[in-house]
């Protein structure tokens, strides 16, 4: 399929020369497999993304973050990379990626690619060479191969637990058929961990950064950023490890990696941004990744994981703003991503917090309640200081889909012995138009069904249907992002908390005031000049439960007057 180049947008949100764009940016996450399918094989592709770039421009985003689009056996949705310098054949070609990067930039939309430095695919040439070379070989030094414990080496080197549950070591077989060494994988056996003490590993990733920066990407999102460095003595995990002393997480030595990467990023004209996936609960140690010579930003997962509760959310906002302030980095705000339960579903549950360990089939959900809260949360997060991440489909109010077990593909499901439904439910292909599957995700003459099935009742959730509905989630997001771009007080900066009744969050950003009512009763709005936007219809000057309003509150003229002569 030939796709014409996209015309430049006259009102692109951030000029190409703006090196601080990332401090206020709205960044849209594209999970390529599920965004848009141009060739009709049931799997999303880069040509499909190119076709939909005008949609993203109209939505008002500043950048696209792509989940891994590299060649991969897809044992973990593409986070098992076998070649960092090419594109998965199901998604297109390297030339397709280059055209997409260029077309997006003409619309004022930058590109961020995913880097997975902790591990590679078990099909990566390095790992295949290591298996063939045998124990003690230089090839194996790039990974964590280790003899087992006990008679015959039958015991795993450690009892570390996988991030996907289960064991972290898999035993190899020697060329003569006898049991061999064990190798480490903090995720699945198909994702062997790299040894970041080896110079080859560091040089390779530095070259990978340059490869993509040279092709015009504006930044990289760094997967599992705190896991790269391991304690070479392989101790067991203490019950309460001291800061920096966990054998596989948040070790102090990891910061030298990111200082090197920052030097590479800063060597390019125009900002090249490092964005970290940093699951570190201690705010001070989290902020260490954001020192001026390391990453530019990192995901704020604390806010996303909190309950729909005013005191909880205010505590998280204060916690993260206070953590970022000493290092001068902007916070990032996100309600979901490709790993977590969608907000429409999460906020409609009795327990509205998020934790991987709590995911179960059949959790009761009130989608009407969840949708109201997700609309309110959309405005709340867009009003907070810093940058905003938006996962594809959240702007449509898509719920988590409880898929039949026989179609599930996520390793989190299988490694939990079927208890955890996994992450496939938030990765269902996007509905674009029409009244039945595939809802415009694939062409009408598609040769295959979508790689994950779409619910039959999604006709009113399509882009087409929501564009025609002034009260839709999509129209709310478009207006919120339009206002956010137009208002100098929004984006990067500071907030000032205002007095509010219990269950209500109110803060000022310049002359824009955000009021979010998380209580179960209407709340009085403060005196204001205009209502810029509301997530639900207002009853006079009262804000309904589970809703947010943005108000214009101009400063009152000074009451003091010079005395008459």
What annotation goes with each model-predicted range?
Residues 1-530, 535-565:
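Active-site and adjacent substrate-binding regions of carbohydrate-active enzymes
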């Amino acid at each position: 399929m030939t796709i014409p180049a996209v015309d430049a947008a006259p009102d692109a949100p951030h000029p190409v020369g703006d090196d601080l764009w990332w401090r206020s940016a709205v960044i849209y996450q594209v999970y390529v497999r599920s965004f848009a399918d141009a060739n009709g094989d049931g799997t999303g592709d880069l040509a499909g993304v190119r076709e939909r770039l005008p949609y993203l421009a109209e939505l008002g985003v500043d950048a696209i973050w792509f989940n891994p689009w590299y060649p991969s056996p897809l044992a973990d949705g593409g986070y098992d990379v076998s070649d960092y310098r090419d594109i998965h054949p199901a998604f297109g070609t390297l030339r397709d990626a280059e055209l997409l990067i260029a077309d997006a930039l003409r619309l004022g939309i930058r590109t961020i690619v995913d880097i997975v430095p902790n591990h590679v695919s078990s099909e990566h040439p390095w790992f295949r060479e290591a298996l063939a070379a045998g124990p003690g070989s230089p090839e194996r030094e790039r990974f964590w191969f280790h003899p087992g414990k006990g008679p015959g080496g039958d015991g795993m080197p450690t009892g570390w637990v996988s991030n996907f549950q289960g064991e972290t070591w898999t035993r190899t077989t020697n060329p003569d058929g006898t049991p061999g060494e064990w190798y480490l994988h903090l995720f699945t056996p198909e994702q062997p961990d790299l040894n970041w003490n080896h110079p080859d590993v560091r040089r390779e990733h530095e070259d990978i950064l340059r490869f993509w920066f040279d092709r015009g990407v504006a930044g990289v999102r760094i997967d599992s950023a705190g896991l790269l460095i391991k304690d070479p003595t392989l101790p067991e995990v203490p019950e309460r490890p001291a800061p920096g002393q966990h054998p596989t997480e948040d070790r102090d030595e990891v910061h030298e990696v990111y200082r090197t990467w920052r030097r590479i990023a800063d060597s390019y004209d125009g900002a090249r941004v490092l964005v970290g996936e940093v699951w570190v609960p201690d705010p001070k140690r989290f902020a260490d990744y954001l020192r001026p010579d390391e990453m530019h930003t990192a995901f704020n997962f604390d806010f996303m994981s909190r309950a729909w509760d005013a005191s909880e959310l205010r505590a998280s906002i204060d916690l993260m703003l206070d953590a970022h302030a000493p290092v001068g980095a902007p916070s990032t705000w996100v309600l979901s991503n490709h790993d977590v339960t969608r907000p429409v579903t999460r906020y409609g549950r009795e327990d509205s917090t998020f934790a991987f360990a709590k995911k179960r089939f059949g959790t009761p959900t009130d989608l009407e309640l969840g949708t109201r809260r997700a609309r309110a949360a959309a405005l709340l997060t867009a009003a907070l200081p810093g940058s905003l991440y938006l996962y594809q489909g959240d702007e449509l109010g898509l719920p988590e889909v409880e898929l039949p077990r026989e179609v599930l593909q996520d390793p989190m499901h299988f490694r939990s012995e079927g208890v955890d439904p996994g992450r496939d439910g938030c990765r269902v292909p996007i509905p674009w138009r029409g009244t039945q599957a595939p809802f415009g995700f694939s062409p009408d003459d598609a040769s295959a069904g979508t790689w994950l099935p779409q619910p039959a009742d999604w006709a009113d959730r399509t882009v087409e249907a929501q564009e025609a509905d002034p009260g839709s989630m999509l129209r709310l997001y478009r207006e919120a992002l339009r206002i956010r771009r137009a208002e100098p007080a929004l984006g990067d900066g500071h907030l000032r908390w205002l007095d509010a009744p219990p269950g209500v969050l109110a803060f000022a950003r310049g002359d824009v005031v955000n009021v979010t009512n998380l209580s179960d009763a209407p709340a009085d709005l403060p005196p204001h000049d205009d209502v810029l936007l509301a997530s639900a219809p207002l009853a006079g000057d009262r804000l309904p439960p589970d809703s947010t309003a943005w108000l214009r509150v101009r400063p009152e003229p000074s009451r003091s007057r010079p005395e008459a002569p």
